[in-house]
Amino acid sequence: MVPVVALVGRPNVGKSTLFNRLTRTRDALVADFPGLTRDRKYGRAEIEGREFICIDTGGIDGTEDGVETRMAEQSLLAIEEADVVLFMVDARAGLMPADEAIAKHLRSREKPTFLVANKIDGLDPDQAVVDFYSLGLGEIYPIAASHGRGVLSLLEHVLLPWMEDLAPQEEVDEDAEYWAQFEAEENGEEEEEDDFDPQSLPIKLAIVGRPNVGKSTLTNRILGEERVVVYDMPGTTRDSIYIPMERDGREYVLIDTAGVRKRGKITDAVEKFSVIKTLQAIEDANVVMLVIDAREGISDQDLSLLGFILNSGRSLVIVVNKWDGLSQEVKEQVKETLDFRLGFIDFARVHFISALHGSGVGNLFESVREAYDSSTRRVGTSMLTRIMTMAVEDHQPPLVRGRRVKLKYAHAGGYNPPIVVIHGNQVKDLPDSYKRYLMNYFRKSLDVMGSPIRIQFKEGENPYANKRNTLTPTQMRKRKRLMKHIKKNK
């Protein structure tokens, strides 16, 4: 399971700045789900190869009425579901009553909490953080998030040791065998026979979507039984349920994000929908089913969730639920809207189903298997280079500064999603339009469906770069004769 780090604190203490610093602003997701404060941010970050989800919980105001009554419900939920909390305070503003109220709440939750004093630029860190020791949260880590000062130390001394304890790196990635074989080819070693077969592994399938789009109904329909979806057990509010199942002789692990709730606490949509749980399920899955409500159409929330799926590189099947009972005219309108708003997702299969009545559900697994097979298929260097050559013959790369970009060869750089690495000269200068052409050409030639495909470009290093030219003996003699001739004619 991908760990979760929550950034907590008063407004304007620098949570968003640290969030952007940790995620490097890539893969950031702005979510506007029901019950969530507008512009709540979720992003993917990593420390030395270990990925985690970072959450900017937004500002929390603690008052004399008690922090629990004033906190945004989603901020409280984020704290509950986080594995570790970075509690941020403003070193310039000093200790505030709201800080004390938040610290009191965090102490009661018994979460791993680290106190981070931000905005220490221009201050004596030791003197600036003295008052915050009264919060009773142990050691204080001074940083200046806007300039990056102290952030590396925070990562190395706080988050990294904690993540090593939570998720040891000994865990072997499913694709490790692929990388070992790839490195062997690169080093000119003979390809060893191995027993690794992606078909022997169960397909991890996550069903995600907004509240009330029919995820639970679809889960129950797939399993062929009514599952109890409300539990009253300690710890069941955080982790998704992993359900092994078999269909048509193929093993699956269904990641259920909709079925775990705490009894008596479901008051509105915010409790029924955990963004964190959904993002963790996406990261852990091989294939993601995105469920959309046909009666409500494509919302901004759907597009935000879709963006996270694409950035994660997961295979995708789009499921339009509640298709039954719609008139033919409405169905045509829904299809037009889908084509317009999802036109950029040309690789994913779209299914129109009724989870309640079961119509169309049986066809979903054919697309799931197709997407998984596409994302894990092995393709050799010779095949990829041949496809690249055919693409160049069909459409030459453009001229860059008067010279034609030369593509030399291609090889596999990874799987799930498939990555094609192309080597050549001036490849970094290729326009985006030609890069898209190559991506689509590889997709069509390899018959990749249901999975994104990524193209990476690498330039060969110029051995003479940054080196001074040296003349050959012949050139030296010619230069001497030329210099004598010039001096004689002066």
Curated annotation (Swiss-Prot):
GO molecular function, a single term: GTP binding
Intrachain S-S bonds: none
Chain ranges of the EngA-type G domain: 3-166, 203-376
Oxidoreductase found in the keyword field: no
Residues that coordinate or bind GTP 2: 209-216, 256-260, 321-324
GO biological process, alphabetically ordered: ribosome biogenesis
UniProt entry keywords in alphabetical sequence: GTP-binding, Nucleotide-binding, Repeat, Ribosome biogenesis
Span of domain KH-like: 377-461
Binding site for GTP 1: 9-16, 56-60, 118-121
Gene3D superfamilies for the chain: 3.30.300.20, P-loop containing nucleotide triphosphate hydrolases
Highest taxon of the lineage: Bacteria
Family that this chain belongs to: Belongs to the TRAFAC class TrmE-Era-EngA-EngB-Septin-like GTPase superfamily. EngA (Der) GTPase family.
Function field: GTPase that plays an essential role in the late steps of ribosome biogenesis.
Subunit structure: Associates with the 50S ribosomal subunit.
Protein name in the entry: GTPase Der
Gene: der
